Amino acid sequence: MGLQGQLSDVSSDSIPLMLLSLLAVFINHLRSFLLRLTSKSNPNLPVDDVSIASGLANIIVLADQLSLNRLFSYRCGDGGGGGSDCVVCLSKLKEGEEVRKLECRHVFHKKCLEGWLHQFNFTCPLCRSALVSDDCVSKTQRSVGRDLISCFSLH
């Protein structure tokens, strides 16, 4: 009858999308319920938005630095750095190895610098000069904080 005609109009691709949207609505309601429940049971429980925003901002800065590491790395011998030591792994930089020269002019193995960055060290491993300005990090933190507030604000 009328119901069968309507079901045949629904594409099989749209059914998973409808289920996904229903799941998203359910999760949103569950999150709202749990937030109300926890705020009633412990009103002194602080929500540390600053540390969440700071952590996410660090991840964004890390992604930017890893991207720069890929873009600005080169083979040793192409742009200098041969014969010196990588202070991260304490090995000699050999011709043909992938290296990266920082703004402070220090050269490291690309993989060693990636490992350094993965520990959220945004300074030169040798002289500790900043790879990212404090202003850039605080801008990213403010931007992430604003995005978090708009994304997770209760309606």
Curated annotation (Swiss-Prot):
Domain of life: Eukaryota
Residue ranges covered by zinc fingers (RING-type): 86-128
Molecular function terms from GO: ubiquitin-protein transferase activity; zinc ion binding
Name of a matching Pfam family: zf-RING_2
GO biological process: abscisic acid-activated signaling pathway; positive regulation of abscisic acid-activated signaling pathway; protein ubiquitination; regulation of response to osmotic stress; response to salt stress
Tissue specificity note: Expressed in stems, flowers, cauline leaves, rosettes, siliques, seeds and roots.
PROSITE patterns documented for this protein: ZF_RING_2
Catalysed reactions listed for this entry: S-ubiquitinyl-[E2 ubiquitin-conjugating enzyme]-L-cysteine + [acceptor protein]-L-lysine = [E2 ubiquitin-conjugating enzyme]-L-cysteine + N(6)-ubiquitinyl-[acceptor protein]-L-lysine
Pathway: Protein modification; protein ubiquitination
UniProt-annotated location(s): Cytoplasm; Nucleus
Enzyme Commission number, as recorded: 2.3.2.27
Alphabetical keyword list: Abscisic acid signaling pathway, Cytoplasm, Metal-binding, Nucleus, Stress response, Transferase, Ubl conjugation pathway, Zinc, Zinc-finger
Effect of a null allele: Decreased sensitivity to ABA and salt and osmotic stresses during seed germination and early seedling development.
GO cellular component: cytoplasm; nucleus
Role played: E3 ubiquitin-protein ligase involved in the positive regulation of abscisic acid (ABA) signaling and responses to salt and osmotic stresses during seed germination and early seedling development. Acts additively with RHA2B in regulating ABA signaling and drought response. Possesses E3 ubiquitin ligase activity in vitro.
PANTHER family: RING-TYPE DOMAIN-CONTAINING PROTEIN
Swiss-Prot/TrEMBL domain comment: The ring domain is sufficient for the interaction with ANAC. Presence of both a nuclear localization sequence (NLS) and a nuclear export sequence (NES).
Record text on subunit structure and interactions: Interacts with NAC019 and NAC055.
Protein name: E3 ubiquitin-protein ligase RHA2A
Organism of origin: Arabidopsis thaliana (Mouse-ear cress)
Gene: RHA2A
